[in-house]
Amino acid sequence: MISLVIPTYRSPEILDICLKSATENQSKKNEIIVVVDGFAEESSHILKKYTDQITILTFKNNKGMQTALNFGVMNASNETICIINDDNVLCKDWDKIIEEDLHPGNVLTINQIEPTGPGMFNFPVKDFGQPSEFKYDEYLEYEPTIRHSRLTVDGGIFPFAMSKQDYMTVGGFDTMYQSPFICDWDFFLKLELTGKTFSRTSKGHFYHFGSTATKNGKDGAMFKATEGPAADLFEYKWGIRPKLYANNSHNPKTGEIIKGIKL
């Protein structure tokens, strides 16, 4: 079994689609943990629809994505965890795909379909509409047509599956970041420094609406303002700016391995 961890923040419409896909498209019953990161009243009517199929953890006030994820993983009862955002739509047999392609010491990214592109992460592009008019059945019909079994090494991004023990070994996501951005780069860098490997599977593709509650949502301006300070914190901590280097655990200027925090 897999523990699927879904942090959610003020996005009831897409959360409904996410949970519908997670519950309907699993090949067997898994643990689905929803961490409500504040404003619980806005999504309570959605959560009630799935109350017998999910575990709900609620913060009265917004604590941030990092705290929500760490809390969700701490409460996961399975060793294999999968972390997604509430703006993901899961494909058929998502759990079977993870079980087939995730190996010990590996962090497995599940490929995504983006509505616009091309982007920096080289995701396939096809627009299935806004949440209010999302073409759910069309997505499920189209997605298998672009699957292939070749694993690639361009992982280290959301959504991803891994071992709970590996997640806890590096302390999860660093809550020093007061932003939903950059903290994931920090997390994957810590994993790389402990020798974990990264891969991406295209046996399945989750759909991604994209930052509906952060960059593009009702609190978008507030969240965008946190990205710069988060990048500064990353540089203070690691000595390099957060960028997509081929090997982010090495300083691109010197080639030397970064041993720890730069104080």
Task: Give the predicted meaning of each segment.
Residues 20-29:
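Short, acidic, metal-binding catalytic loop of nucleotide-sugar glycosyltransferases
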Residues 66, 139-162:
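A recurrent flexible, glycine/aromatic-enriched loop bordering the glycosyltransferase active site
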Residues 81:
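Short aromatic/hydrophobic "clamp" motif used to bind/position activated sugar donors
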Residues 92-130:
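Conserved donor NDP-sugar-binding/catalytic core segment of glycosyltransferases
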Residues 178, 200-221:
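Active-site donor/metal-binding and catalytic loop motifs
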